[in-house]
């Protein structure tokens, strides 16, 4: 036996004797700076609290030009909305995806500053904003009276947490010819959603490509449906 090899053979045992297993919990409040530009269309000369529609734009409207967030949105079709409502459209920074923590905190801040009916907050968004819509609805289902996603990418986190959507009034819109975000995103998500939320609706526009937002937001029935819903306290 070569004795000079003994220390190497004993090394793993030595390391095990010097290791310790630590079980603990991190419980600390971390402060972070939150910054997000937005447009708020708030009705004039209204008495009492008003409903709030939150709109999350797609990737093409990111950046620092706030006028872009009005494109392809409920802003375009305000004349179809038959009662006074506030419309909130934040802007996602360039080269980013939606930070739903910041969006949530922005909504809470708007509630503090303006007369918003907490039982009538509605969430919608298209493409990247549709993803943000589903993500925020998953994280805070207690906030929204109705949710409408349009041509939204979906992910495994959403389907793994599908129970979060079970009590929401929801519509999923998608173009049947969409070659940017394939319709399979909507189909697969709805297959998971329907068993836990049978009232949720999947709406496919068979001839629409990625621009299914036009068919969605130009339909006055969308706003009638949204505004008919109230969040139970």
Task: Name each model feature, range by range.
Residues 1-21:
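Bacterial Sec-dependent N-terminal signal peptides
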Residues 52, 56-102:
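Active-site machinery of serine-nucleophile hydrolases
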Residues 113, 119-164:
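Primarily recognizes the serine-hydrolase "nucleophile elbow" in alpha/beta-hydrolase
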Residues 170-173, 179-233:
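C-terminal catalytic histidine-bearing segment of alpha/beta-hydrolase fold enzymes
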């Amino acid at each position: 036996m070569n004795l000079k090899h003994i220390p190497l053979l004993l090394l793993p045992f030595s390391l095990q004797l010097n290791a310790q297993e630590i079980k603990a919990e991190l419980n600390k409040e971390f402060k972070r700076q939150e910054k997000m530009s937005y447009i708020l269309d708030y009705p004039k000369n209204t008495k009492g609290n008003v409903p709030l529609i939150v709109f999350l734009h797609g990737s093409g409207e990111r950046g620092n030009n706030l006028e872009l967030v009005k494109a392809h949105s409920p802003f375009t079709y305000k004349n179809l909305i038959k009662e006074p409502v506030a419309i909130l459209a934040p802007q996602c920074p360039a080269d980013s995806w939606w930070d739903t923590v910041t969006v949530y905190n922005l909504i809470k801040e708007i509630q503090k500053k303006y007369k918003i009916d907490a039982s009538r907050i509605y969430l919608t968004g298209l493409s990247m904003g549709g993803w943000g819509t589903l993500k925020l609805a998953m994280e805070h289902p207690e906030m929204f009276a109705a949710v409408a996603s349009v041509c939204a990418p979906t992910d495994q986190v959403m389907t793994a947490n599908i129970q979060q959507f079970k009590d929401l009034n929801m519509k999923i819109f998608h173009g049947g010819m969409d070659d940017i975000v394939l319709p399979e995103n909507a189909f697969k998500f709805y297959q998971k959603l329907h068993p836990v939320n049978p009232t949720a609706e999947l709406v496919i526009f068979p001839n629409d490509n990625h621009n299914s937002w036009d068919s969605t937001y130009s339909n006055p029935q969308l706003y009638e449906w949204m505004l008919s819903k109230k969040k139970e306290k």
